[in-house]
Amino acid sequence: MLKYVDLKEKPSSFLAATGITDEEFQALLPNFETAYRQLYATNLTFQAQPRRRSFGGGREAKLASFADRLLFILNYQKTNPLQTMHGLSFGLSQGQVNYWIHRLLPVLRQALAAMGMTPERDGAQVATASSASEGGANLSVDGTERRIHRPVNAEQQKAKYSGKKKAHTDKNILLVNENTKKVVYLSATTEGKKHDKKLAEESLIRYPKNATLTKDTGFQGYEPEGVLTAQPKKRRKMKS
């Protein structure tokens, strides 16, 4: 069963499980605990009923510590597993996993926002976002896809099927500051079938003055006004 106290002793495994280092985890943890206490009163049970015994009393819960709760939600976000499989990693039933996911995601979002680490979701705001110009407005754009369960509806199956991934997916585009490696912008989630270029155009991103933009072939033809774009050429494989 995954526990923070055990996993932190294995740096490479910790990074693979959460996407961050233990040092970054420790910086996030106090904000995560503060956000949790702000969102959920500790004098109430998880069902919002008055608590009869003191908080932390009784049998120890599987996710008793804030460190384990943060590990749980970061690992879920990083790996996107089936809830049943995620439960096996933390000793929880599928129902308990579903409960904790919905309880902890708002906490994580609030904690990251308090640290100024949440990306813009409105493309029009990118031009004035300090994160976009930090160190110079050298940006890169990329599409990211996540596998999803095959939809039951036939039309949804067609819309969600990504020819690139040969699977049913959801898609977003990310705008990253190449100087700081921070995600500046995260688009709305859309079906995996949609092309990267089309999603970028629909996002109506406004760029800072004198911005440069690195893109791949998925964004060929995407030329925002006033932005110097570059598309690195792929090396051709040498025939043996």
Residue ranges and their predicted role:
Residues 65-79:
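Short, amphipathic alpha-helical "recognition" segments used to contact nucleic acids or chromatin
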Residues 17, 61, 74-75, 90-93:
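Short secondary-structure transition/capping motifs
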Residues 59-67, 162:
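Structural motif
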Residues 80-240:
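Short, well-ordered secondary-structure "scaffold" segments embedded in the functional core
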Residues 1-61:
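Charged, often Cys/His-bearing segments associated with DNA-binding zinc-finger transcription factors
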Residues 30, 34-41, 78-82, 106, ...:
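Short helix-loop boundary/capping segments at the starts of domains
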